[in-house]
Amino acid sequence: HAKESEMGNDTQKIAPPKLGEPYLLTPGPLTTSYAVKQAMLRDWGSWDDEFRAMTRKMRAQLLALLGPGHEDYDCVPIQGSGSYCVEAMLGSFVPRDGKLLVLANGAYGLRAAKTMEYLGRAYRLLDKGDYLPPRGDEVAAILAEDADITHVLIIHCETSSGILNPVEEIADAVNAAGRKVLIDSMSAFGAVPLEVQRTNYVAMVSSANIAALTRI
């Protein structure tokens, strides 16, 4: 009975939707607090001093999540979906004469490979299916065999399955081979540690689109 009472008290602390709409329990930025909705009523000028200061603070706070060594990096906010961000990273960091090793174990790794086709850049795909993570030893073997590979894309958490891939293990293999690490941490950054000093990646992308309103 005590537990039921505690649960009842906790439930009462959750404010009901202000406008009477139902709770939405599906994934994505759907149910938001009234305070967030109120904040969105204000129009911001992109060059207003207050908006620029807020953006500067946000960038600094995101960089701090990278841990020691974050001073050598910059945070570049861009608009668009998560796939848009991944495409921007691949198109910017993999040169036209480079080659990317895409590590896939789900829909988003495969989508990155398709993006490389659209970009007209060389790539090699290691497809582990939907249930197995790529491992450092098999990545090391591919890099030893294929000298043309310049970059390796690691999916931190494969969103379609929820599999958390062994980023540090793979990054160790890539760095040992003298190649460069790119990370898609779309559904993990901010929830799972990803220290740059430990993985030595050259670029990482993430997004709040899965948990917050667009462009927040």
Residue ranges of predicted features:
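Short, Lys/Arg-enriched N-terminal segments with co-localized hydrophobic residues
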Residues: 1-6
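Conserved PLP-enzyme active-site core in the AAT-like
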Residues: 10-22, 26, 30, 61, ...
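A glycine-/small-polar-enriched, mobile loop at the entrance of the PLP active site in fold-type I
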Residues: 21-78, 83
